[in-house]
């Protein structure tokens, strides 16, 4: 706050202060309303976009990936339109959800997804690839999705911990193993991605851990930036 106001020095006005106060207190839905009309060509990908795509990665695309049709190739808007009724059902959308205090990913992801696709900024983001692995023997609860922005940049989003025992067991394993199977899978997923593209890697919670781990371990320097939103046990990664 101080840095922002110092930039304006004696020229600062109550208008600047009020506008910055509004920006500082925005949530994701406010951001979509404020910047949703700007494509990525005009306003480049930023940390809030990373947060939104990290949350959207929690949506259970596997419900349709395994049952009806492949999700790859669709824009987010096309995907939601195609599966609109099921998105509501699987997401259990509550129109009155408190986005600031009720942050259970499975509940908020469908809500934010359906809101985001109504904006120019997110509607034309294309789903390039999706992978979901749940293996009790190997102790893996892993999901990742690759998006392509309207400017051609790709974003790999790693999903965090779900409500399964396997997912929580993974979190515990992160505290004493140098590498868990899910981290190895995260690196493998990125290394199998298409070359010749510019990438961002993002994730929330365990997904943030996998994003940073992948960034450190990847074979090629193809990543422009990595955003780990509340990535768990990041300190352990930095000691590897």
Where are these regions (language model features)?
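Non-catalytic, mobile gating and regulatory segments of ester bond hydrolases
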Residues: 2-202, 209, 213-240
């Amino acid at each position: 706050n101080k840095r922002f106001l110092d930039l304006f020095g004696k020229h600062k006005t109550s208008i600047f202060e009020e506008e910055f106060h509004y920006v500082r207190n925005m949530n994701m839905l406010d951001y979509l309303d404020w910047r949703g009309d700007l494509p990525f060509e005009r306003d480049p990908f930023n940390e809030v976009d990373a947060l939104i795509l990290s949350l959207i990665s929690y949506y259970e695309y596997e419900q349709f990936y395994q049952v009806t049709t492949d999700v790859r190739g669709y824009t987010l808007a096309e995907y939601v339109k195609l599966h609109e009724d099921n998105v509501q059902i699987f997401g259990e959308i509550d129109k009155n959800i408190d986005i600031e205090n009720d942050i259970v990913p499975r509940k908020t992801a469908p809500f934010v997804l359906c809101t985001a696709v109504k904006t120019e900024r997110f509607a034309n983001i294309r789903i390039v690839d999706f992978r979901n692995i749940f293996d009790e023997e190997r102790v893996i609860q892993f999901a990742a999705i690759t998006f392509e922005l309207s400017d051609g940049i790709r974003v790999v989003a790693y999903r965090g911990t779900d409500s399964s025992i396997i997912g929580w067991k993974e979190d515990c394993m992160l505290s004493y193993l140098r590498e868990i199977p899910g981290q190895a899978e995260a690196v493998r997923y990125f290394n199998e991605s298409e070359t010749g593209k510019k990438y961002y890697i993002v994730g929330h919670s365990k997904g943030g851990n996998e994003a940073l781990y992948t960034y450190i371990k990847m074979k090629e320097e193809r990543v422009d930036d990595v955003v780990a939103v509340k990535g768990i046990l990041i300190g352990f990664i930095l000691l590897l």
